[in-house]
Amino acid sequence: MAVNLPDLRIPAGEWLKTAFNLPMSTNLDYSLELFNHPGFIRAMEFDRLGLYDKASTEFSALLTENQDDALDVFRLIKVFLDKGYYRSALEASKIIAKLSGYADTPFSAAYPPYFTYIEYGAYYLPWIQAAAEKYNLSELLLLSVIYQESHFGAQAASGAGARGIMQLMPATAEQIATETGFLSTFEASDLDVPYYNLELGSNYLARMLYVFEGDDYQALAAYNAGPGNVMSWIALTGDDPDVFLNTIRYQETRVYIRNIVEIFNRYSLIYGQ
């Protein structure tokens, strides 16, 4: 599943010049104006200081400000990837697709695969592969859940308090960390560390799959809405997955599962699995 993005970036850059009528001499890596923008300078300084949540906020604002400029968005993608701000890179690739008219046809042969591999990136791949093997999970399922939960944003946080790439509630994560001995002490901020979040989230997803006897729909519903709710829905529907999906009383959870199925199918198509 590993992809050499730097190699794919070269033809993507040439395509960008043609698609947006840019001079062939255009510098695709650097812009004095962009890299001296106060927001860019703040983001880089926050990143240097390890204040990743603040850096992420600044990068997101900078991307929004430049969302009509395909060239600067392309330049920012490289910065985001180099610095590990994968959510911003993913969002930037969507902007390129929109500006170039490929938002609805991202798999077109005329559209550079560079952007598709960024939007559906196999980020944190060594950790995902290790977690998948440890907990007998599908690598693509883990990628799909992370995509749906956070778009690979390490600093992602929900209004309900869920945090990190797999959007774990601190109480749930602490329980798993304590039971498994994975962390000797647990702080909610540990969930902002992708490796910790992935380990705890994979453990929880594997637990849900065990409880619901390998039923993906039921396990995903439990991951999103809690196992208690899922058990009450099963009591009404039995084992038919389609009936179960339509009986889920929370629209958010129904949409959640359908989104993950679609994301999973796209990952399967892109990576040939």
Identify the meaning behind each predicted range:
Residues 1-16, 29-31, 54, 61-273:
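Catalytic glycan-binding domains that act on GlcNAc-containing polysaccharides
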